[in-house]
């Protein structure tokens, strides 16, 4: 249990000047104090893990600690505004600051970033796939928790938000019992072809949606259409999806820079004509997973004459979008 582990390691994981302060207070006398905790940048309140840990420590030490917040979980707060008040014995609180701050800052900033992702793409559903990029399971749980908080706030603005996480333990934050996911590239390589990997997946999980991972052999269009043709009876039920994860070193099958510009100018001309940074331009028309690539794949699949129904494409942005949230925590 993470709470127990952190409790046992308070002395070894706390900033040393807090430990020295505790010795001084022990020598010269304790006082009742109130800590006002704040962040130096705006964020969304996601402090449940910190509060639960402080309560756990209070129970272990058999002391009384009063905890209050002027905000509710999911509320926005400003830079420098107190988001948490902790009152109690200074001797028993002073050595906790390092560890509870570790549970407050990252969660609040990640929740804000998750919120922004969801409202920027309100019609898209997201899966939190940060686990493989985190520094341990505690951070992974923290990021999933933060994604759930930011997502709930975004849903109040009619965004679809996060629908789950890729691992089972933190799936409780999304009211699920297990993680979500389909297949890694390794399975496509193991199967020897995209279509064979789908056959294996469907034979093992016949009741689940088929999610095509078509970039392994560089045939995003051809392989997607091949799967749709073979599983058209599922495509008409919206049970065939495409996960686009093309690396940034190349364009998807049949696409290039000129075609990318043509697509964006046709379907979203204002995004090209108005001001945008070079980084934003790369996401619009660059190689890999771009806005143009999504449109191109969608248009190509919908032109498949062998499919009797329009293929439903759902891009859950599984291409490490959440990892960028983790990076921005430390900005």
Q: Language-model segments: which ranges?
A:
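Flexible, solvent-exposed loop/hinge segments and secondary-structure transition points
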Residues: 1-94, 98-107, 111
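Buried, small/hydrophobic-residue-enriched core segments of structured protein domains
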Residues: 41, 75-77, 84-307, 311-326
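C-terminal structural cap/anchor segments
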Residues: 328-331
